């Protein structure tokens, strides 16, 4: 089993509004810095990573449960599953992103990835509460 870390942020906005903002690739691109340069091509979506590599990205279909799971397909590597949820929390919501430590990932890289996700979720909070 892979090690996991779930990073959360509480947002003072109705969960449905946050979900609607995040559920499209265009919405993701506004706050998720790791998915910069999202483009729709003939075979689906792709993103340019911070390292400059273009990788295919799949997004879960729209749903009524606040599930925002997505998958990255780096060249020459196994597909990476990125589970994400938006849940109601009284008048606001909590966004949860579960980071799965990939095989061979160092402690330092796992910690850096978790910090990156936390920064992106803080950016999402800022945008949604503005």
Regions found by a protein language model. Give the residues of each.
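Hydrophobic ligand-binding cavity/cleft-lining segments
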Residues: 1-39
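Glycine-rich portal/gate segments that line the openings of hydrophobic small-molecule binding cavities
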Residues: 27-81, 89-90, 130
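Short, intrinsically disordered, mixed-charge
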Residues: 20-33, 64, 115, 119-130
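Beta-strand/loop substructures that line and gate deep hydrophobic ligand-binding cavities in soluble
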Residues: 72-130
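Short beta-strand-to-loop capping motifs
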Residues: 11-13, 49, 72, 101
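Generic structural detector for well-ordered beta-strands
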Residues: 8-12, 58, 85
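Hydrophobic pocket/interface hotspot
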Residues: 17-22, 28, 59, 70, ...
């Amino acid at each position: 089993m892979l090690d996991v870390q779930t990073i959360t942020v509480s947002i003072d906005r109705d969960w449905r509004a946050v979900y609607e903002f995040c559920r499209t690739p265009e919405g993701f691109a506004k706050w998720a810095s790791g998915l910069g340069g999202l483009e729709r091509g003939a075979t689906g979506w792709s993103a340019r990573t911070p390292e400059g590599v273009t990788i295919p990205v799949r997004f879960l279909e729209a749903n009524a449960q606040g599930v925002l799971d997505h998958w990255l397909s780096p060249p020459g590597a196994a597909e990476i599953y990125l589970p994400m949820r938006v849940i109601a929390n009284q008048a606001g919501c909590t966004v949860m992103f579960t980071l799965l430590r990939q095989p061979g990932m160092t402690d330092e890289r796992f910690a850096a990835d978790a910090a990156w996700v936390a920064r992106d979720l803080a950016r999402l909070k800022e945008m949604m509460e503005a």
